[in-house]
Amino acid sequence: MSKFFNSPTVGIDVSADFSFVAILAPNGDVFKKPFRIKHDVSGFNHLLKEIKKVEEEFNMKTAIFMESTGVYHLSLFHFLNKNFDNTFVINPLVTKCNKNVDIRKVKNDKKDALSIAQIGKFQNIKLSQSVSMDIF
């Protein structure tokens, strides 16, 4: 069982220009339907406000999970990591294995964001909390 089992969790499916975000309540129910943010100051600030609402609602820290996506997740990861203690990157092989569990192979960004939030909340997996900005 994950150490974030009793925490609200955020799952983020990152792509080049935007991300889909899903938020789970501490009991595992969907707290906020998956929504889209752009990778710009306005989008990042909107996400910041949504996560702070969750923390105020439940009076506890939120765990934030996103899949490693080459370079696309780096700006969002560093923005969130600066604002929240529990920001983590999940190996894409872990999320791929979890997608293979479903009988129906449905692929969409909203479902992927929800799946990432559930993986972080319910599974005891290896997480990365630091990402190097060094390229060479």
Can you describe what each PLM-predicted range is?
Residues M1-F136:
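Phosphate- and other anionic-substrate recognition elements at nucleic-acid/protein interfaces
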